[in-house]
From Swiss-Prot:
Keywords: Membrane, Mitochondrion, Mitochondrion inner membrane, Translocase, Transmembrane, Transmembrane helix. Residues 1-15, 67-72, 153-155, 224-232 are mitochondrial matrix. Pfam families: COX3. Component of the cytochrome c oxidase, the last enzyme in the mitochondrial electron transport chain which drives oxidative phosphorylation. The respiratory chain contains 3 multisubunit complexes succinate dehydrogenase (complex II, CII), ubiquinol-cytochrome c oxidoreductase (cytochrome b-c1 complex, complex III, CIII) and cytochrome c oxidase (complex IV, CIV), that cooperate to transfer electrons derived from NADH and succinate to molecular oxygen, creating an electrochemical gradient over the inner membrane that drives transmembrane transport and the ATP synthase. Its EC number is 7.1.1.9. The lineage of its organism: Eukaryota, Metazoa, Chordata, Craniata, Vertebrata. This is Cytochrome c oxidase subunit 3. It comes from Eudorcas rufifrons. The gene is MT-CO3. One of its GO terms (molecular function) is cytochrome-c oxidase activity.
């Protein structure tokens, strides 16, 4: 083993960036094949290779940080900056959807009937399932904060309980959203209202699924005693991401469900 005179992690050569790029190519090509030729072979291949790449890449990161000690305070600081920049990029991603929604709704064209919601669209009642979804996500924000405080205080059992509650609430939100989509009186093809509604809420739903998966990984890592009160960036990143998902939903609820209806 060579002697290291600095606090930074010099990453070993890894095949995962290459396999990740190839899986992304397969997924995008597969989507085109699915849309135009109703063939899902390439898409399934891309999704499978992408899942395998993510599993093996993050397995390596966990090994390097938890078992090999490569994630020094300086490395963790860099990872925190990286996560902050990633969340900022996600904010800009959702800004595009809100821009499309407000561009269409604040000055509805004659084709839409000069009103919003457009003529013929029956919007969902914001005081029914959407309000329940809001309370579910707000409760999950409280429970993830409870988990974080429990971890900082060294209370492992409370941390696991709070994390489990957060995951359960995330899964419940996803099921409620799926039932709402199934019962919705309009579709993604119903003009600009349908497309902005389903694209914005659908991408948020995808982020909830990603965040829930992130938290499930943290739950199993905590079962194996991977986190301590001063070394838990994996969980911290998951908590930041979950709070971001909460805040985006509040904007979606106020804009699309309440004001937009």
């Amino acid at each position: 083993m060579t002697r290291q005179t600095h606090a930074y992690h010099m990453v070993n050569p890894s095949p995962w960036p290459l396999t990740g790029a190839l899986s992304a190519l397969l997924m995008t090509s597969g989507l085109i094949m699915w849309f135009h030729f109703n063939s899902t072979i390439l898409l399934m291949l891309g999704l499978t290779t992408n899942m395998l790449t993510m599993y093996q890449w993050w397995r390596d990161v966990i090994r390097e940080s938890t078992f090999q000690g490569h994630h020094t305070p300086n490395v963790q600081k860099g990872l925190r900056y990286g996560m902050i920049l990633f969340i900022i990029s996600e904010v800009l991603f959702f800004t595009g959807f809100f821009w499309a929604f407000y561009h269409s709704s604040l000055a509805p064209t004659p084709e839409l009937g000069g009103c919003w919601p457009p003529t013929g669209i029956h919007p969902l009642n914001p005081l029914e399932v959407p309000l329940l979804n809001t309370s579910v996500l707000l409760a999950s924000g409280v429970s993830i904060t409870w988990a974080h405080h429990s971890l900082m205080e060294g209370n492992r059992n409370h941390m696991l309980q709070a994390l489990f509650i957060t995951i359960a609430l995330g899964v419940y939100f996803t099921l409620l959203q799926a039932s709402e989509y199934y019962e919705a009186p309009f579709t993604i093809s119903d003009g600009v209202y349908g497309s902005t509604f389903f694209v914005a809420t659908g991408f948020h739903g995808l982020h909830v699924i990603i965040g829930s998966t992130f938290l499930i990984v943290c739950f199993f890592r905590q079962l194996k005693f991977h986190f301590t009160s001063n070394h838990h960036f994996g969980f911290e990143a998951a908590a930041w991401y979950w709070h971001f998902v909460d805040v985006v939903w509040l904007f979606l609820y106020v804009s699309i469900y309440w004001w937009g209806s």
